[in-house]
Amino acid sequence: MINAKLASQSHANHQTIVKLSEQVSVGGTELVIIGGPCTVESLEQMETVASQLAAAPVQALRGGVYKPRTSPYAFQGMGVEGLQILADVRSRYNVPVVTEVMSIGQIEAVAADADMLQIGSRNMQNFDLLKALGQAGKPILLKRGLASTIEEFVMAAEYILSHGNPDVVLCERGIRSFDNYTRNVLDLGAVAALKQITHLPVIVDPSHAVGKRELVAPLAKAAIACGADGLIIECHPEPEKSVSDARQALSLEDMVNLVHSLRPVAAAVGRNISEVGAGFSLQPAPIHFSAKKPCGLTA
């Protein structure tokens, strides 16, 4: 029995619905799809993503500006500059954005420009960070640690809830295994269990679970079939040129096709894909791009 006083199903007589904006919520009968690149690389990139994914539709955009990388020599993200790009796209297209925070010092700035703050797998048990997020005033997307038990995952959410933030969404993103054919192993049993254990919404990240774009669609469908409230999927205008996690990124065309293919699966389990994103591509203001290379990288 998991001793989660606030996260447990017994604490609430309803399933929690977390609002990202006036039109977009996670939980309930409508499934939410969050899409976008692993890393924010340029304003032009994010404009392209936002305009094309509106047709899917995708209800929120993701994009990393602070990147926790295994190697200290890997690109660490655009930081404040990337955050400004997200803010511009969010404002111009009236679309919620999700991005990761890695430290307490980043919370205030990220919360000012993002609609949901993500806690990545590596920080799932960064307890001081979790406590601080209890006062962030924004919904939190909490990813499961790569070697964490279900109980540890739920208790990490409990830290955020117990420090004042009721808006927590859980994300199953795969756990480490002896088999390295896929990047991780997607634990769909955990999704079903979490839906019984807690009242919190649960979404799935099939991109990080498998690390191979050709396997993302089957696992996305399986996630919806087993009760997930939504998906967060990586996609890129030119996947092979992505500065991080290129192998798992879908093309924007494949992303749109995937969302369409999810509809009959959702219908089979009494759910439907939200149509909200179909209206977020408003008339963007003309933008003049500089010749600066994405991420400040040199050729």
Residues covered by each model-derived region:
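N-terminal amphipathic alpha-helix/helix-capping segment at the start of soluble metabolic enzymes
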Residues: M1-I34, A267-N272, I287-F289, C295-A299
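Active-site mouth loops of central-metabolism enzymes
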Residues: L31-M46, P72-Q76, P96-E100, G120-S121, ...
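Hydrophobic faces of well-ordered beta-strands that scaffold small-molecule active sites
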Residues: V32-P37, Q59-G63, V97-T99, L117-I119, ...
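Glycine-rich, proline-tolerant flexible connector loops at the mouths of alpha/beta enzymes
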Residues: R62-E81, P237-R247
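Intrinsic, low-complexity polybasic segments
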Residues: A278-Q283
